[in-house]
Amino acid sequence: GQGHLESIELTDRDSGECQTVPARWLFVFIGAEPHTNWLENVVRRDDHGFIITGRDLVTSASQHQELPWPLAREPLPLETAVPGVFAAGDVRLDSMKRVASAVGEGAMAVANIHQYLALT
């Protein structure tokens, strides 16, 4: 465009069909689709592949008997179904899906790791 975004070109992944549509803004959601298949049967994930952490591990335990929370204590906020393994950012269920939130969760994960190490 002339100094600002005027249109975007969209391509259908299945058909390959392209179309140009008018647009003044563009928001990129890179983490909107988690790529966590490699974690299947390792940590608990929802039906969309987002990693379940913290208190959600305990409240959703009846739905996922194959990966129950194994300890008597409650999981730390970013802890996965594997004690001492943490998830942060867009890959985590119910995260904000924003860069600033992901950065904050990364810092929070460090604090969770320190808490975990103090417990062991």
PLM features: residue spans?
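Short, proline-enriched alpha-helix->beta-strand connector loops that line the catalytic pocket
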Residues: 23-24, 81-83
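A Rossmann-like FAD-binding core segment of flavoenzymes
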Residues: 1-59, 63-71, 115-119
